[in-house]
Amino acid sequence: MSRVCQVTGKRPVVGNNRSHAMNATKRRFLPNLHTHRFWVESENRFVTLRLTAKGMRIIDKKGIDAVLAEIRARGEKI
């Protein structure tokens, strides 16, 4: 399973660790992913999404039905 938010599309990015001597070593910055179950009243079922904390805030703002419609419009299967 890839480390990608299903709502925002955020994925890992690459950067550098920097020591005190400013030596650079490669590292990955991972998104703050959580697996969360949402009750969808219109479909009378639970939907499990893998999303970031920001994605949860978007669902709080727009509602689960609107967000699911956007995800399905992109062609993702839920």
From Swiss-Prot:
Gene Ontology molecular function, alphabetical: structural constituent of ribosome
Record bears the keyword Ribosomal protein: yes
GO process terms (BP): translation
InterPro entries (alphabetical): Ribosomal_bL28, Ribosomal_bL28/bL31-like_sf, Ribosomal_bL28_bact-type, Ribosomal_bL28_sf
Family matches, as Pfam families: Ribosomal_L28
Presence of keyword Transcription regulation: no
UniProt xrefs under Gene3D superfamilies: Ribosomal protein L28/L24 (2.30.170.40)
Protein name: Large ribosomal subunit protein bL28
Entry similarity comment: Belongs to the bacterial ribosomal protein bL28 family.
GO CC, alphabetical: cytosolic large ribosomal subunit
Keywords in alphabetical order: Ribonucleoprotein, Ribosomal protein
Natural source organism: Glaesserella parasuis serovar 5 (strain SH0165) (Haemophilus parasuis)
